[in-house]
């Protein structure tokens, strides 16, 4: 397990930005523009090594099954790989894809039937971190000023989003997250993601890196 490090005791109050580290920034920019999520993330060129499951997913919540299909289709057309075809479940309707840069995206709706045509509207974006100990990580984050919005024991925690944040932050057990996404739990190297906060840099006990956000306002990458 990666030991937590801290550069300051100053506390972030919410996740303000998400930066994906990619090998080919121009290719990634084209993909995310075509996928329709480019305004929700930032991109940074990086050659750091990463194999297997990176320990997180970005999840889109949309209005209905037709919109899930639309986003999955756009991702595949732009070069994504389907990990789980879009299908009904006990919780609604969802599909999982892996972007060409390796980031896993889940597109879901709680609705099992459409009440209108497909749109390109996103209701919510959630960054779900797969961690070894949800309670311990929750404590680290609350100690640094994040506010818990929902919590289900040691299984799941969701933090309150800032007014300017395009992405909500949540914690889930790493093994359970990998199972939900349809991938093996094993993975080594960098997570290839940097979380922007409102305080100084630190790295949590699962190796997720936070840095001070230059600006809380989201801008297209």
Language-model regions: role of each:
Residues 1-83, 98-153, 161-221:
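Glyoxalase I/VOC metalloenzyme domain signal
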Residues 90-92, 196-197:
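Short, small/polar residue-rich loop motifs at catalytic or cofactor-binding pockets
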Residues 91-95, 155-157:
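Short beta-strand micro-motifs in enzyme catalytic cores
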């Amino acid at each position: 397990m990666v030991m937590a490090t801290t550069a300051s005791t100053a506390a972030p109050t919410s996740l303000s930005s998400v930066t994906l580290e990619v090998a080919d920034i121009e290719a990634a920019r084209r993909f995310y523009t075509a996928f329709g999520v480019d305004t929700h993330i930032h991109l940074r060129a990086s050659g750091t090594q990463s194999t297997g499951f990176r320990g997180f997913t970005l999840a889109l919540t949309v209005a209905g099954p037709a919109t899930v299909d639309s986003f999955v289709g756009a991702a595949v057309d732009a070069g994504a790989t389907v990990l789980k075809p879009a299908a009904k479940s006990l919780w609604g309707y969802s599909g999982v894809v892996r972007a060409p840069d390796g980031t896993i995206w889940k597109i879901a709706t709680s609705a099992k039937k459409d009440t209108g045509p497909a749109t390109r509207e996103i209701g919510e974006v959630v960054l779900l971190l797969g961690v070894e100990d949800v309670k311990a990580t929750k404590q680290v984050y609350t100690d640094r000023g994040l506010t818990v919005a929902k919590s289900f024991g040691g299984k799941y925690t969701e933090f309150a989003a800032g007014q300017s944040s395009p992405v909500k932050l949540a914690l889930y057990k790493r093994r359970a997250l990998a199972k939900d996404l349809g991938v093996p739990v094993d993975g080594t190297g960098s997570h290839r993601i940097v979380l922007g906060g409102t305080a100084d840099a630190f790295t949590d006990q699962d190796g997720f890196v936070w840095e001070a956000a230059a600006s809380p306002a989201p801008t297209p990458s």
